[in-house]
């Protein structure tokens, strides 16, 4: 009998929690909208994106890690979503809190078509992240040789070095420098 009563109370508690009215707090609403927006980017939900675009939502909104919907969509391989964001005016040059861009994320994940599309934007090909690395260095490290040629054609310096002395050219040849042990 006790088990039955506890089960009944547990069900009643969950029901009461599920029936709470939506919040009118602007901060809560803003956070919920951000969550929907970023989840749409991860999933590639174009209908949801269209709703955000049509409502005038800021396409370059960043989460607590500095990720934009474009960075998330590129990283998760959502090509049509990336294209729609760029056509609607999203900024491909925005960096997350570590300084990485959508292009760097696409290269890291091996999303070559997305990376090629991002290369067609007006971003500096030698833009550096917080560790001093460029998109070309990512392409070299992860053996995305076809992208190295495109980055070079766009003006990327394949001999530029990060603080450790790595360059895209060295990384592409398999030479990786690491920090000296302390």
Q: What is the predicted role of each segment?
A:
Residues 18-55, 64-67:
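Intrinsically disordered, low-complexity regulatory segments in ankyrin-centric signaling systems
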Residues 39-44, 72-78, 105-111, 138-144, ...:
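Ankyrin repeat A-helix N-terminal signature
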Residues 45-53, 78-86, 111-119, 144-152, ...:
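Ankyrin repeat structural motif
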Residues 67, 71-83, 87, 93-121:
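Alpha-helical adaptor scaffolds
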Residues 140-182:
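Leucine-rich solenoid repeat scaffolds
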């Amino acid at each position: 009998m006790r088990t039955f009563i506890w089960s009944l109370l547990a069900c009643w508690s969950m029901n009461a929690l599920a029936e709470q009215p939506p919040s009118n707090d602007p901060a809560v609403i803003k956070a919920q909208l951000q969550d929907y927006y970023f989840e749409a980017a991860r999933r590639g939900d174009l209908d949801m994106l269209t709703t955000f675009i049509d409502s005038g939502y800021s396409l370059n909104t960043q989460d607590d890690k500095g990720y934009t919907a474009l960075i998330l969509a590129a990283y998760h391989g959502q090509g049509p979503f990336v294209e729609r964001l760029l056509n609607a005016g999203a900024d491909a040059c925005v960096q997350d809190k570590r300084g990485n861009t959508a292009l760097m994320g696409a290269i890291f994940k091996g999303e070559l078509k997305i990376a090629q599309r991002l290369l067609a934007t007006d971003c500096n090909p030698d833009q550096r992240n917080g560790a001093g690395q460029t998109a070309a260095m990512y392409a070299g490290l992860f053996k995305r040789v076809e992208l190295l040629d495109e980055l070079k054609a766009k003006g990327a310096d394949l001999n530029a070095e990060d603080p450790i002395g790595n360059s895209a050219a060295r990384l592409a040849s398999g030479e990786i420098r690491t920090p000296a042990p302390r």
